[in-house]
Amino acid sequence: MGLMSTRACTGVNSGRMPVNPTKIRLSILRQAGKDQESHWEVFEVPFREKMNVISALIEIQRNPVTKDGQTVKPPAWEAACLEEVCGACTMNINGGIRQACTALIEEVGKPNGDAYEVTLEPMKKFPLIRDLVVDRTKMFENLKKVQGWVPIDGSFDLGMAQPQDDHIRQFRYSLSRCMTCGCCLEACPQVNEKSSFVGPAAIGQALLFNLHPVGKALEGDRLEFLTGEEGITGCGNAQNCIKVCPKSIPLTRAIAELNRDTTKYRLKKWMGAV
């Protein structure tokens, strides 16, 4: 009943009878390559309840004809898990960064007469490959910079894991949910062409492994990196990262804790205790 009421309200136009949208009008920013000119193409596909943006893109892929009747190459886009786990389908949808697989048309579309209007653009903080596909390599390169792994130099008996405080374990779990989708980098004003800041995702992973009983072996190396130009000082505390993170990762808390840890590390290093 609530859904019907919402549609009725959004469908009212100057006293006319309310109109339930029957189609989706997608405006897609297209670009054949990073050195090519970009342009907009508009497609219309039939609307079905509970459709997501990926479903609409699949409809276009099956019949790549624009609203004006022109047959074109199907727009390029990425998807894998379709359950908001891989991050491959991340794009700007009606001006907001999120995953296309969980973006329901009823939620993100703007009702306009008999159509839901949806605008799709690629992420702007990553090199463009084609249309809605970008190269997220720098996220994985940043993980290398913070040494986002547990160092293992041989084979060991499994045995019992080292006990860990339950609060730390729960915090580590929240940090481990990162899927390197790029939402936080896209929303962060400090991540730009003029800055070398590694971004919130890599910093969160640095803390994740610093809190690991074995990963802690590389804590000094990670803190040393984070005290440099690419690290903690690059954060401007805009807090956009936690607003857009699809996994609600406490990124600002991670940055704050590492800010404390790097300060203690530098003081100890200055006093020769490191």
Q: Where are the regions a protein language model picked out?
A:
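A generic, well-ordered mixed alpha/beta core segment in the N-terminal half of proteins
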Residues: 86-139
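A basic, amphipathic helix-loop patch mediating RNA/tRNA/ribosome contacts
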Residues: 60-96
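N-terminal mitochondrial targeting presequence
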Residues: 1-19
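Short, thiol/selenol-centered motifs that function as redox-active sites or metal-ligating centers
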Residues: 26, 86-89, 100, 178-181, ...
